[in-house]
Amino acid sequence: PRGSFKEEKIADFVCSFAENLGLEYTRDSANNVVVRKPATPGYEAHEVVMLQGHMDMIWNKRPDSTFDFEHEGIKLKVTDDGYLMAEETTCGSDDGVAVAYMLAILQDKSLKHPELECVFTTAEEPGLYGVQKFDCSQLKARKYVSMDGNLEGTSLLIAAGAANARFTKRFQREVLKDAAELAIQVHGLTGAHVQFQERQLANAIKTVVRIVYYIRKEVPCRLISLNGGSQTTIPVDCTARIALALEHMDKAREVAQRVLEEVKFEHKESDPNMTLSLSEKAHASPAMPEDVTDKVVTLLRLLPAGLVDTSLVFPGLPISSFSLETIETTDSSIGWFYRPTSAITSKMLDMDEQSRLLAQLFDVEYHVENYFYGHNVEAGTPLYNVFDQVWFEQNGEHIRPIGAHYGNEIGFFLRNMPWLDMILLVATHYQAHTPDEKLDIASFDRCYRCLVEILRRV
C-alpha cells in the first residue's frame, strides 16, 4: 500500500519498471517520477503528450479490521457485479487507475503515439505536497492528459484551489484543585469528502465546540483537550474534555444534551444518526488556562466552516468553502487543520487573509503549509475535440464538461505550463477514500481503449 509520504517503494518499482524497458526516467527528492517513451515511427514531429496521475492512496479500513497498511498488501477481490474492491480497506483506485494506465502504455510496444512524458506524482491526497516540489522545466509536453477523477465520459473544466493552513495555540497546563472531568463526544455524523460542501453536512468539531461554548455560558469550565476529524473529510467524530466543579456536572450534561438536540434538528435530513456520548471522571487532568480556553473556543465558534457560494454555470457546484477538518491537542498545544477553498484564486487568497486576521485577533498562530491552485478551462480545444470524437465513436455519447469542488494537480501544471492543452480522462469508481471504494472494471477497459486511441490520433 502506497500511503501519502510513503511512496518510496512504489517509486522504486516505477523506476525499475522503466529501467527494465530501457526507458529514460528521472526521480526527485519527493519521489515524483517522470518516465519518457519515445515517439513511434511517423509521430516524431507530433507535440509531446504528458500523462499524469498520483501514486499515493488514502489508507482507510473498517473499524473492526486488523489490517496493517505498513506491512500487508491490499487484498483485492472482484465482485459479481463487475467491480474491483479490497477486503476491509480502500482499494487504491484513486489514483491507481492512472498508474496502471501509464505502466501499460509504457510497456506496450504495439501502440502508436507521440513522445510521451508519464508523470507519477506523490502526496497528492493530503494537499498536493509532492507536486509542489516538481520541476516543470524538465517537461516538453504541449498536451496534457490528467487521470485523477472518478466519472467516465466527463472532463473537468473547473476545479478549486486552496490554502492548506494550520492554527496553533501553545500553552502551559494548570492543575485545578477539586475539579472533575467531563468528556463530550459527538459521533455518528454522515461525513463526506470535503468537496461535497453543497450537502451542508454537520461538522463534528463545530458541533462539539458549540456545546462547550454554551456550557461555558452556564458554568465555569476549562478545556483539557479537543480531538477529532480526518483530513479531506467533513468531520464525523470529535471529543472535548473539560474540567469543571463536580457540582456543575449535571448542568453541563443538560446543556450538552440540549445543544446536541438543536444541532441534530438543524441537520435532521443530512445527519440523522448524530449521537452524543458523555462520560465523567472524578479527577480532571491538567487543563488549559482560562484565557487560552476562551480564545480557542471563541475563535473556533467564529471560524466559518462549510459552503460559501455556488456556481452560476454549474448549478449546485460549490465555488468557495471553508473546511475545518481535524483538531488535535498535545500536552502543550492545540492545533487544527483548516482549508479556505475556492475555484477563483483571488477569492481563495482573500479567504486565507480573513482566516489570518481572525487568528491575529485571538493571538493564535496561523501558518499556511502550502497553496494549490484551481483551474478554469474551456471545452472545444483541439485535444478536447479529439477526446469527444473518440468517446462518441466508441460509446455513443459526447463528453460532458463538469466542475468539481476539489483540488488536484491539474491547477499546478496549468499554472506552471499555461500553454498546455488539457483533458481529464478517468474510469468510474465510487466511494473513494472509504473501505467501500470500488472500481468499475468495464469502465476501466472503456477508458483505456479511449486513451490509446486518443494518443494514436494526436
Model-assigned labels for residue ranges:
Residues 75-89, 189-190, 392-397, 429-432:
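Glycine/charged-rich beta-loop-alpha catalytic/anionic-binding loops adjacent to active sites
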Residues 195-228, 365, 369-371, 375-420:
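Active-site-adjacent substrate-binding region
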Residues 44-45, 246-255, 345-350:
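Short, conserved charged micro-motifs
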Residues 312-315, 319-339, 390-391, 395-453:
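Zn-dependent metallopeptidase/amidohydrolase metal-coordination segment
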Residues 199-218, 249, 292-301, 308-312, ...:
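His/Asp/Glu-rich mid-to-C-terminal helical/loop segments that flank catalytic regions of hydrolases
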Residues 3-47, 402:
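A non-catalytic alpha/beta surface segment that caps or lines the substrate-entry region
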